[in-house]
Structures are given as C-alpha cells and as structure tokens.
Amino acid sequence: MERARRLAILGRLVSQTKHNPSISSPALCSPSRYVSSLSPYVCSGTNVRSDRNLNGFGSQVRTISVEALKPSDTFPRRHNSATPEEQTKMAEFVGFPNLDSLIDATVPKSIRLDSMKYSKFDEGLTESQMIAHMQDLASKNKIFKSFIGMGYYNTSVPTVILRNIMENPGWYTQYTPYQAEIAQGRLESLLNFQTMITDLTGLPMSNASLLDEGTAAAEAMAMCNNIQKGKKKTFIIASNCHPQTIDICKTRADGFDLKVVTSDLKDFDYSSGDVCGVLVQYPGTEGELLDYSEFIKNAHANGVKVVMASDLLALTILKPPGELGADIVVGSAQRFGVPMGYGGPHAAFLATSQEYKRMMPGRIIGVSVDSSGKPALRMAMQTREQHIRRDKATSNICTAQALLANMAAMFGVYHGPEGLKTIAKRVHGLAGTFASGLKKLGTVQVQDLPFFDTVKVTCADSKAIAEEAYKHKMNLRIVDKNTITVAFDETTTIEDVDTLFKVFALGKPVTFTAASIAPEVQDAIPSGLVRETPYLTHPIFNMYHTEHELLRYISKLQSKDLSLCHSMIPLGSCTMKLNATTEMMPVTWPAFADIHPFAPTEQAQGYQEMFKNLGDLLCTITGFDSFSLQPNAGAAGEYAGLMVIRAYHMARGDHHRNVCIIPVSAHGTNPASAAMCGMKIITVGTDSKGNINIEELRKAAEANKENLSALMVTYPSTHGVYEEGIDEICKIIHDNGGQVYMDGANMNAQVGLTSPGWIGADVCHLNLHKTFCIPHGGGGPGMGPIGVKKHLAPYLPSHPVVPTGGIPAPEQSQPLGTIAAAPWGSALILPISYTYIAMMGSQGITNASKIAILNANYMAKRLENHYPILFRGVNGTVAHEFIVDLRPLKTTAGIEPEDVAKRLIDYGFHGPTMSWPVPGTLMIEPTESESKAELDRFCDALISIRQEIAEIEKGNVDFNNNVIKGAPHPPQLLMADKWTKPYSREYAAYPAPWLRAAKFWPTTCRVDNVYGDRNLICTLQPPQEYEEKAEATA
C-alpha cells in the first residue's frame, strides 16, 4: 500500500509539472553540469497514457529515464571545469561554433583518432564505485610483519604528520618552490631536512631529496666520475651493498662508459690507477657493522673517492660517515616516518663536502635575504640544473621527493635528537636480544660481526625457517639456502621477538622469553663506532615535541605557501590539475602502505591486479604494446626510455648508434637525459612559427644515418603547438635507422585525441604527476612509466630481487637492467592515476583533453590584445598551453618575466613558467580543472599588470621604482612605520577588487638570488646569526 501511495504521488507531481509551467523547474531539462554528466537522454522520456484509476486524473505522465536512475556521483563533471553551455560560449569567443570545431582546427587531421575505448571501466566508475573497487583490491593484499630490511622498514608514521602533511592538499598540491616569496613554508621544512641530513652524516652539504637510495648511489657514482674529470673509468662496489643498488649503478655506468666491479672489501685493488670511486654500505646489507676508517684512508691515498650508503636511524648512534672520511654519503629517509608503500615514494638524500657542491644533483635550498635585508629562503645554485645547462647538467633530476622529505623532516622535528636516539637504541636492543636468544637456542649460528638492526643467521635450511615464519605472518630475507637475515625496526615488539624464537627453535622448546634475557644483552656496537658528536641541536628540533606544538608548526609553515587550495597555478608544461580526494584516499590505507617491496608477490595480489589493469589502460591511451611502471619520475622515465632504445640497438649489433637529435622545442630535461645515456646530441632549430625545421631535421638525420639512435620530441611541442609535420618527422627518423622517443610532458593534450603510438613514436614516458593527477607535492613525488612498441618490449627494465618486465609481458625478455630501487617504482601513488583513469572513463578523459585545449585558447584570446602570443598552429589556435611574449617590455618599460611573476603574487597567483622554453616569455597552462571564473580572474590580473606597465611606458611612473619592481608586497612591508614608495600601500596590496574578500599574502619581499649563491648557506643557522646577517645587509 505504501509503495502504491508513493507511486500515485509521484505520478500526480509529474503530471502537474507538465501541465503547469509555473511550477516546473527550468533547470530540470537544461544541460547543466549535474544532468548532462549523467546522460544526454535524461530529459527525453516518452509520454504515455496514465491509468485513470491510479491517481484520479485523466492526464498524461512522462516515464522516468533509466539513465536518471543511475548513480549520481559521477566523476567527470567534478574534474572537468566547463559545463556544456560554457564550452560553447568559450569556443564562440575564440571564434568557433562549438568545442569540437575548435578541436578539429587544432589537432592535425593526419594524427587524429576517431575514438578511444577502454577494455575496462570504459563508461567510468562513480566515486563510490571506485572506492569499493579499491577496497576490494586492498583486501587482496596481505599485510605480513616485515623483517626483510634491505633499505625498507616498517615505521610508525606519526598521525599528526600523516593527516596534516601527507593527506593535506595544502601541502601536496604545491609546486616546486620556484616563486620563493610564496613558498617560505616548505622551503623552511626542506632546509630542516637538509640540516637533519648534514648533522647525521657529518658532511656540510645536502640536497633536498633524490628519488631513492639506489639512484642516489648512481648519482654519487656519476659525481665521482665528474670529480675525476672522466679520466678514471672504473667504479668499485662492495658486495655488502644492497643488490638493487648494485644493479642500478651497473645500468647507469653504461651511459658513462664506466666499468663497474663488484668485490669483497678485502679484495679491492687500486693498482690500475683507473678507479674513480668506491661504494660501501654502512651498515652492510646483511647487517655487518664495519669500521671503514683505514679503508677510506687507503682509498684516498690512491686518489679514489669514497661513497658510503648509510642508514639515517643507525647514524643517530653510530659514528657519522663524515668523521670516518667519506666523500659522499647517500641513503633513504624512508624509515623516518614514511610508509614502505610497496617500494615508494621515499626521499633519498646525498650529502657531500663544500668542495663538490656544484657537482651535486637535485634541488638545494639555501638561505638568502630579501629586498628589505631580512633572511629568506630559496632554491640555490639553479644554474647547475638540467633545464639551464641542458646536456652539461650535473644530472637530469628535476624535483624529486619533496613531500616525503618534508614528512621525514617533521619526523625528526617531532622526535628530536633524544627521541630518535631512543628509537635507534630500542631497535638495536631488540636485534641484540634476538641474537642472544638464538645463541641460547643453539639451533642456528649467529654472525660474529657487530650489527645495528639486522642479524645474519646461518642455518641448515633457510627456506624451511622462512616457511615457518610465513605461518606466523612474518617475512624474512633468504640470502641463500643456508643464510637468513632478520631486520628489526621501530614497529617490532618484544612479543615479535618471542615469536621469532619459536620460528628458529625448529620444534625445540623455548625455555625463555625476550623479556627475561634482555637485561643480559650487551650493546653490540664497538666503542670506536659509537657516535659522540651531537646532532639536531638547532631549536627547531628541540621545541615541537607535543602534538599541539607540531600541529601549529606544520600549520604555520603551510600558511606561508600558495597551493591549488588558493588559486590556479598556471605553470606551462607542468599541468597543475585537480588532485581529487577520491584519488588520494587509498594512498594511506594500510593495505597499500604497509607492504615491503620485496614481499612475495602472492601477498600483493591487489597491487598486481592494479598493475595489470593500469598497464592495459595506459596501452590503450598511448597506442603502445607494453609498459614498465618502474621509473619513479619523469626524468627517470626519459632515461629509461632512451636506455631501452640503446639496448635495442645493442641487441641488433648496432653498437655505434649513439646520435640523438633533439629539437630546441623539446622538453628541458631531454638533453641531460640523452647525455646520461652516452649519446652524442645534435640540436635542430625551429621555424618562425615554432615548428621543428623539418628540412634541418632531415639533413641531420641523413648526415648521421649510420649512427642515428633516436629523436627526442615533445608533442605538442613546448612552444604550445601541434606540429602538422609530426608524422613526417617520425618517418624521417625511421627511414634513417633511428627510433622516436616522445616526451610525455604534454600528454594532457593528446589523451583520446591522438596518441604517441598512433603518431609514430616507439617509446614515450608519461608524467603521471601531470596528465594523470598524481600531485606535485611541492617538488615530488612523481612517476614516469614508459610505454613501448612491441619490438622494444623485451628490453624494458627488470629487478634483481623481484623480476619484472613489461605489462603486458612480452614473449621474450632481454631487460636493459634496473632503473629504480623498487620493482614497480613508487607503487603507493599509482592508485591515484589508476582511479583517475577509471573514474573518468574514455569519454570523460577525452573531454579533459578537449577542455584543456579550450581553456588555453580562451585565455590566449583574452590576452592577445594586451600581450603578443608567440606561437600558434596553422589555424591560429594553440594547444593546451601557450607562450606570452614579454621581450618588448624590457626595452619599453624595463620589465622582465620575473617582475610580472612577482606582481602576480600581489594578485594572489603563482606566476607562469618564466623564460622557458623561450627567454623573456611566460608559458601558461590552465588545465581542464580550472573554471571559467578562475581563468578570467587570472587573465584580469595579467591585463591589469599590463596597464601598470603602460603607465611606466607613458612616463607616468618611475622606470625603476614602481609597483611592479617593488612586488611582491608582504604585510610587514605594508605596515612599516615609514612608507617611501611612490604608490599607495592600498594599491600595492589590493590591485584588484576580488582581493578584498580573500587574499593570499606573501611572507617576504622579493628574494635576492644572487646574494644567496654568493653567500651559500644550506642548513639552519643559529637564530642570532640570522639577525646579524639582516643587520649587516640593512
């Protein structure tokens, strides 16, 4: 009866709505964001005769469309900004009748796809369906207690850090701190990280993170080669290093023509005079703790540099490598409060002496002063970096793992020196108790060498012991058939030790407990290796030890930084799009976060299923046949892709093919990546429209026909245009024996419209942190998986501990080596891209590309009467980004891109990419996630700034002392007792009306980069020193 009554009411309401326009809702059948995202047929129900006896009215009713009954939490309408009405209006403003006509005019017909269809999730999952699917995958992962070690450890992630940094969009949606005045918070945190690393390693210089420990070791190897000016071509690695580190170094050495020798320490031989450096592990991969003092003295006596891979937690109680004499120290900060995540992301580090500071890879944060003379932070020595020095750069690494470095730094701040020492001593005590108990049992033999946290055990059958541990949901490391290691960590309990006694008892009764024998256990660290030097003495590491205090410190730093929480970040070639909450949620679920990368794959079936699905989806999107998920950054993907090409040529006997052609319009990291692969780089130019000069390219390819290895091309180009001749370009390279490497930096303008494989590329890396929604994290993490055509699939990277390869797997495999420390790179953040692709569906993700192009063209049209737009396609349109030419303004008004970017801060915006790829310009990329209102607000800001520049040009304001040159204007400057500027405080602070409702304030005046590089300080200084420097520069 109740159901019948409700149906009657529903029928009456529908009938009344139809026959009484005054009560009908005009929005019901309008193509709004809500309705149109469900189905275009929601409002097209057919009229039928109603049952007169049902409701007493002789009226007609409309049926309810089945589409209207589908779930309402669809995702594309939440991600893509423009409604259908807005799309049409914006397209008309640009000069086209609709969005599709704009796309037809922009993307060359010769490479246009008819359509794209997923084999799975084609219609897109709703947000609730996606969460349910991820929960199902998570349930297929088994969380065992890990005692594997090898550089990865369970850790107790402080929840205050988890919630307020890792799960906080105010931290994870920031970009690399290029605009220092609105990035002082994370710059301070990264300076804390560098200080923590330098204190613990005993060396004065550290970078602000690298990708992982293995690649950090490879970077250190490259440094040794550079320090020796390439004259010594052998690098020796101790056999006590982690196997993944050894393999990464071997792979990397090929590009530098270095010979890598793996040897026991006692067998190191420098007699050839050809050794540039050595790598040792401290403590060793199997736990042994050695005093390297004499070893290092001997190496130095032979002109050999020493790299030491170390453990940060161990260094809180061990003599620091710097005091032992090490030249370079590398390692991972993972166990400082960052989950294992099946391999990453984690912040690695590299520390060295002041002597080698300009040879260091990665970002470095330094102390400087602002225009008022007050201390301020910024990225130091940027002239070392790949987008500036290109093939002469120290490394191809861009941003690395800033978000994870910030987590590790906060872990150090939260615990402080005493807290960290307590954790280290507890871990060491648990390992010592375990070793003592095994000796008591007598069923196995324990290594005699001292150890920190890892105990090496010799037994009759290591597999049998590991299987017994498996029954207790514990994973041990099997070294060989007679050797096992057991690594302890912060999460290990005394009860775990008792369980391990039962495992190793092999059926023998255990007559004691860990608690009962613990008082008898002696410290296993030799007196000569006990740390005596204090560390983390700065007040920052000694004042935030309660949750309230740390919460406020984190919040204080966050408040200094502009993120996507505040406004769009229109950095060209960076794709700062929405990082949706549903995409981010699975990242911190224990079922994904707490798995060791070397755990048996049957314990990670949820991950494995996701990898397979993601590989298939990426193949569909790119037109490739197989993918490797191992490269854990865009730069790593570039390197991996080129190494695949190199391996392909080598396998065919074409060892001489080493020439790489790179257009000037290619992505900035390309030359550095090619140089790392040992390639000879030939640059080709562009024409007046920004397109690759095809005839120049043809001549270069034909002239190097016998040695041509690859072309590196970015598409659309970094000039913001779809080049009409891209298919011809690919054919030229193939006809001359080369392979085409496509940089995936601009994939956001390809998805669903064309694809690298369709265009003719052989290999391409994808920036999952751009096109596929992994957040930039203030400078990392990222992922750079590579897709390849079938003929290159056998050469995709593998791993020495857990063999991997292409997804789908090729019929045969000849892997090039190992690219990253973990088998599947930074696996923990892959769910972000996976959920984005699955929720968008093929149509939604195609529309994302279209709207990104629409937004860029809309902005270019709004700005074209105020600034020259440098390059356009054949039909007058741009791709998903465009370049604004400011070069004339330097002559007419003394204004440069930096000035405009700093004034944009006063308007509440992060500046676009400055002076790249063309000096004196700004490159703008809005992405599909920004609303028309936000696009207009940014355009209004740039137009307003152009009017301010016009006042300079007219002579109405001073050429050097004006509101643009004085920008940005922080509160302390505006509230100063004296105001000497020739413009008002009000105009400096509120140049646009919307700022009065809400404004993001910079926290410092314009930072002096030159002063900072001339007076290089890259660690926290005592507070009084900051005050003295400020007074000296005032």
UniProtKB/Swiss-Prot annotation:
State the reactions this protein catalyses. Answer: N(6)-[(R)-lipoyl]-L-lysyl-[glycine-cleavage complex H protein] + glycine + H(+) = N(6)-[(R)-S(8)-aminomethyldihydrolipoyl]-L-lysyl-[glycine-cleavage complex H protein] + CO2
Enzyme Commission (EC) number: 1.4.4.2
Q: Kinase among the record's keywords?
A: no
A biological process (GO) of this protein is:
glycine decarboxylation via glycine cleavage system
Q: Name one Pfam family in it.
A: GcvP2_C
PTM-bearing positions, type N6-(pyridoxal phosphate)lysine: 770
Q: Which cofactor does it need?
A: pyridoxal 5'-phosphate
Primary localization = mitochondrion
Superkingdom of origin: Eukaryota
Cellular localisation: Mitochondrion
EC class (word): oxidoreductase
| Molecular function terms from GO | glycine binding; glycine dehydrogenase (decarboxylating) activity; pyridoxal phosphate binding
Q: Where is the transit peptide?
A: 1-63
SUPFAM superfamilies for this protein: PLP-dependent transferases
Keywords recorded for this protein, A-Z? Mitochondrion, Oxidoreductase, Pyridoxal phosphate, Transit peptide
Assigned GO CC terms: apoplast; chloroplast envelope; glycine cleavage complex; mitochondrion
Per the record, the similarity remark reads: Belongs to the GcvP family.
HAMAP family in the cross-refs: GcvP (MF_00711)
Indicate the quaternary assembly: Homodimer. The glycine cleavage system is composed of four proteins: P, T, L and H.
Q: What does this protein do?
A: The glycine cleavage system catalyzes the degradation of glycine. The P protein binds the alpha-amino group of glycine through its pyridoxal phosphate cofactor; CO(2) is released and the remaining methylamine moiety is then transferred to the lipoamide cofactor of the H protein.
The record's section on PANTHER family has: GLYCINE CLEAVAGE SYSTEM P PROTEIN, GLYCINE DEHYDROGENASE, DECARBOXYLATING
Protein name (record)? Glycine dehydrogenase (decarboxylating) B, mitochondrial
Organism, by scientific name, is Flaveria pringlei
